[in-house]
């Protein structure tokens, strides 16, 4: 009986022991065990995939296209170089959205020849406009004024109105008429003082009678802007220097519709022409001096330069197109 009871007790206890041995996490089960330690920081870093390698940017080629003004300058330089002459060019735009100026050898000194008559006639116009001088005042010839020129009717006691002498000196570039006007103005010193007062600082007029393209342009710009007597002076001056006897320089490169107020000069292998040009909405001042080639070739160079500049001016826009940045997108309203 005792033996049977012991066996019964053994049968009851054995399953309980087995249950205890297989309880998860009890650690009682004998034999090899696998211990999983917590994941460390270094292990996690190794698990992160490496950042993609930066792809090298391809080089960007920027193409810079020359502007129309750059092309104009290059073309004028080519015309001057091909001529074989010394060439001075001075351009100042008086119209358009961007009033450019151009000077190629503009400060180089050239023999002025009759170009001194530009400031001379401007001085006369200013005096007429201010009332200091009368267009009908009679000015008389002095034998010391004589120089070969267009007219030959000067003699002792001959007198001419200021208007008559201005037309002779301007439209026909007559030398004796210009000498009479210089004398009544106050002589060469007075002429040079007047010229320097509005920017002709590199010129030595009359003697040795030199000037530059930039100086001649300065004279015309001041006249065109009304700084030398205003519209009254212009109304007196412009007809005197329009449709002259010498139109084979700057006017020859322009359309017949253009108004060209200008004055030429030529002597000792030098040709000068300086002008105020107006045609519709376009206006500008151009001065060109050429030295070192024969006279006919010199005028041809001036005409070619004039024509190329006109071609450029004709293609310029009439106004500036404003660049308006696009409006920034509006942010959605935040509702609370």
Sequence positions of predicted segments:
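Short glycine/serine- and small hydrophobic-enriched flexible loop segments
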Residues: 122-130, 218-225, 307-311
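Structured C-terminal helix/loop/strand segments within mature extracytoplasmic catalytic/sensor domains
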Residues: 2-83, 108, 227-245, 269-336
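Active-site-adjacent helix/loop patches that line small-molecule binding or acyl-intermediate pockets
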Residues: 60-73, 143-146, 154-232, 240
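Active-site SXXK
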Residues: 110-141, 286
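Structural recognition of the beta-strand scaffold that forms the well-ordered cores
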Residues: 88-91, 113, 168-171, 180, ...
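Short, conserved catalytic-motif segment at the N-terminal edge
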Residues: 85-109
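Short Gly/Thr-rich strand-loop-strand
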Residues: 243-264
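Acidic helix-start/capping segments at beta-turn-to-alpha-helix junctions
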Residues: 68, 72, 94, 136-152, ...
